[in-house]
Design a protein with these regions (language model features):
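Charged, glycine/proline-rich intrinsically disordered loops and linkers
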Residues: 20-44, 51, 289-310, 316
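Primarily recognizes the serine-hydrolase "nucleophile elbow" in alpha/beta-hydrolase
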Residues: 1-6, 19
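Alpha/beta-hydrolase-fold serine-hydrolase catalytic core, especially in secreted/extracellular enzymes
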Residues: 83-84, 163-170, 178, 211-333
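Compositionally biased, low-structure terminal segments
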Residues: 2-3, 59, 128, 140, ...
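Substrate-gating cap/lid region and adjacent catalytic-acid/histidine neighborhood
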Residues: 32-226, 235, 242, 330-332
Length: 333
């Protein structure tokens, strides 16, 4: 529960159930509801939930969604339900928690720009075709923090956990290619950049992506893009053959090393027009990103920072990051 000493979320499943108990008049207040819920086994809880009116359930979630607009509360996206995700959560700290096979983790540098381009606080879509970015700096900032947050969950945390558990063959990458062309006022290198799914035509080698390739590739950038694609296919093929991408099938690429606790961690995949293919020793931690965001002078207002954090914490399970969010954004709630 949120008022326990151990950090929790104001809209955790237990908090929601307690609100439902009060809403259905099964308990007179949240304190009584918390006690009642703790005394229930899973079958009693199931019976209670199945007996609730649908309107009561929607009422609680609508109230949460309304306050979410103020950057105050949220519903977690990652649920340790014991079926899809183990009750222990997304953890790889022991070898018994995963299948011990060679693994590649990877994300794109600007993952969330694909979704932000469709609709966000700083952009809009006209006629489902034309994209208008109203504030490029804030648009980029939103993507920067959200994409880093994605990388923490999908790459850095599992890589660290597996390496710390004794696993050796953990590889990671970040796709950075962002050389798309322009159409009218739309600069797709800024609107999309290295967004979600942009790596697909490079991995497959088709240089096609549901028609989007018309705006991705042109006579100027295609030759270098193809060279990057050939390199990526070579790495992927070598990994499939041997479990180690190494220097690719022809042994002529920069070596893709495993994640190292004290050294290089992931491979940056970019064209020679930019930084090329190179290893990086940079890593991300959720609490550090949350603190960096709250100290970021580019974001002027604390309530805007809390709106950012509100979205980021929905994918967080680290207690220190959740505590930081609660302290900065939920005081007085």
């Amino acid at each position: 529960f949120f008022d326990n000493k151990e950090s929790s979320l104001l809209t955790s499943s237990k908090e929601v159930v307690s609100k439902l108990l009060v809403s259905s008049e099964s308990s007179k207040d949240l304190f009584e509801a918390n006690i009642a819920q703790d005394s229930m086994n899973e079958f009693k809880l199931l019976e209670l939930m199945q007996g609730l009116d649908l309107g009561q359930i929607f009422k609680v979630y609508k109230a949460i969604d309304k306050s979410k607009q103020d950057g105050k509360k949220m519903i977690p996206r990652v649920l340790s339900d014991g079926h899809v995700i183990p009750k222990r959560g997304i953890k790889f700290s022991r070898k018994s928690f995963y299948n011990d096979v060679p693994v590649i983790f990877g994300t794109n540098r600007d993952e969330t720009k694909l979704f932000n381009a469709i609709e966000s606080d700083y952009s809009t879509s006209l006629f489902n075709r034309l994209i208008v970015v109203r504030n490029q700096e804030m648009y980029d900032l939103t993507a920067e923090y959200a994409s880093n947050n994605w990388k923490i969950s999908a790459v850095d945390n599992p890589s660290r956990d597996m390496i710390n558990s004794g696993k050796k063959d953990v590889f990671a990458y970040r796709f950075d290619w962002d050389e798309q062309g322009k159409l009218l006022w739309m600069d797709f290198s800024k609107i999309f950049g290295a967004a979600h799914a942009m790596e697909i035509p490079f991995v497959t080698g088709t240089m096609k992506l549901l028609g989007i390739e018309r705006f991705m590739f042109n006579d100027e950038n295609l030759p270098d893009a193809i060279r990057l694609s050939i390199a990526m296919q070579s790495y992927w093929a070598e990994f499939a053959y041997t479990g180690d991408p190494g220097k690719g099938r022809d042994n002529n690429l920069p070596r893709w090393n495993t994640w190292s606790s004290s050294g290089e961690k992931f491979l940056i995949l970019d064209s020679q027009n930019d930084q090329g293919i190179v290893m990086s020793d940079f890593e991300l931690r959720r609490i550090d990103e949350f603190k960096r965001l709250f100290a970021d002078s580019r974001i002027k207002k604390d309530d805007t920072k809390c709106k950012f954090l509100n979205n980021l914490v929905q994918n967080a399970y680290e207690k220190d990051a959740i505590s930081f969010y609660n302290e900065k954004c939920l005081q007085g709630e």
